[in-house]
């Protein structure tokens, strides 16, 4: 972590904390001991953290404890190690305290449910389906069912109540729509454990299983903006929002690869593995290819940020700047969080 990175414009690589090395030609198994390398393009984007980071982190832990969403020791410790409050403080450094606390609690809720239920060993769509139905009911009615078997629906209803106070109606609607896609994606994720999906299918769903599409929708309100429909529909603005969500999910697949391989005892079925299967590549070459996909998206995002920063349309330059900081905080996210660290 203390090594000096090369110039971002040369697109060098920076080492992970620890990683895995893969035998040449091996697409199925990996051996612990080497380093995966992640493209270093972060110097293209600014980065800073909200001064409210510590306060928000503490508040989210209190919120989680109050709702008793995670009572098992293992998932509970991993959730605390995620440091969600500090992560949102990096993504949205200019957000006011109440909005930053809400965003942290929302991501803590999503992560807690994913850790406890979606990632549970052997979970089936039949077991997960009733949870999804209850969440959709909360999205539609704003209230939780009276006899819910877990506190998750009631906690979601509370989060949506707070959203109505903090967001404009259109911003709230966008967040609800993206949450609905998350619930579909959670069911989809269970189906991928018994089949190999295409990279196209994976890339369609991954921004929702990683919650990055939800995160991208929060950039506007967290920057204090209320963009018009015309601005939101602008192709450049839409593509930049998509690039942010894509970069978040792709870089997570790279940075978490070593941790997931170690935790699973096998190669994680994420983007590098899927590229290896689809193209017949050794896993190390497929990992490098996934890194190139990240580089290409980063270059595109950088170009769009430059173009939109010069726009005369109201709110567009400010939105471009907010996205730039959301991208730029990504590398520090993996320095701040202990969730994916090798032991």
Curated annotation (Swiss-Prot):
The keyword Lyase applies. Mg(2+) 2 binds at residue 119. Its cofactor is Mg(2+). It catalyses: (13E)-labda-7,13-dien-15-yl diphosphate = labda-7,13(16),14-triene + diphosphate. Mg(2+) 1 binds at residues 114, 119. Mg(2+) 3 binds at residues 252, 256, 260. The Asp-Asp-Xaa-Xaa-Xaa-Glu (DDXXXE) and Asn-Xaa-Xaa-Xaa-Ser-Xaa-Xaa-Xaa-Glu (NSE) motifs are important for the catalytic activity, presumably through binding to Mg(2+). This is Labda-7,13(16),14-triene synthase. It comes from Streptomyces clavuligerus.
């Amino acid at each position: 972590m203390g090594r000096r990175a090369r110039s971002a414009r040369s697109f060098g690589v920076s080492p992970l904390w620890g990683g895995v090395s893969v035998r040449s030609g091996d697409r199925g198994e990996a051996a612990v001991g080497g380093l995966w390398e992640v493209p270093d393009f972060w110097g293209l984007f600014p980065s800073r953290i909200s001064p409210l980071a510590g306060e928000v982190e503490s508040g989210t832990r209190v919120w989680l404890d109050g709702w008793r969403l995670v009572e098992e020791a293992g998932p509970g410790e991993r959730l605390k190690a995620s440091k969600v409050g500090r992560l949102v403080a990096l993504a949205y450094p200019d957000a006011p305290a109440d909005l930053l606390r809400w965003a942290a609690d929302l991501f803590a809720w999503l992560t807690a449910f994913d850790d406890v239920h979606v990632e549970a060993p052997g979970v089936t769509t039949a077991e997960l389906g009733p949870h999804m139905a209850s969440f959709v009911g909360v999205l539609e009615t704003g209230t939780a069912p009276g006899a819910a078997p877990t506190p998750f629906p009631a906690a979601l209803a509370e989060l949506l109540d707070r959203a109505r106070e903090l967001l404009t109606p259109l911003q709230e609607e966008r967040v609800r729509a993206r949450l609905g896609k998350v619930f579909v994606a959670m069911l989809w994720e269970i189906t991928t454990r018994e089949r190999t999906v295409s990279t196209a299918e994976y890339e369609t769903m991954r921004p929702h299983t990683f919650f990055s599409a939800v995160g991208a929708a929060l950039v506007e309100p967290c920057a204090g903006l209320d963009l018009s429909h015309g601005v939101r529909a602008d192709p450049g603005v839409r593509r930049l929002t998509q690039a942010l969500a894509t970069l978040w999910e792709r870089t997570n697949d790279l940075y978490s690869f070593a941790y997931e391989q170690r935790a699973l005892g096998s190669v994680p079925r994420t983007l590098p593995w899927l590229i290896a299967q689809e193209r017949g590549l050794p896993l190390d070459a497929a990992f490098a290819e996934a890194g190139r996909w990240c580089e290409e998206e980063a270059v595109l995002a950088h170009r769009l940020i430059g173009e939109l920063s010069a726009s005369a349309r109201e709110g567009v330059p400010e939105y471009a700047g907010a996205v730039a900081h959301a991208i730029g905080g990504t590398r520090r996210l993996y320095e701040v969080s202990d969730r994916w660290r090798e032991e």
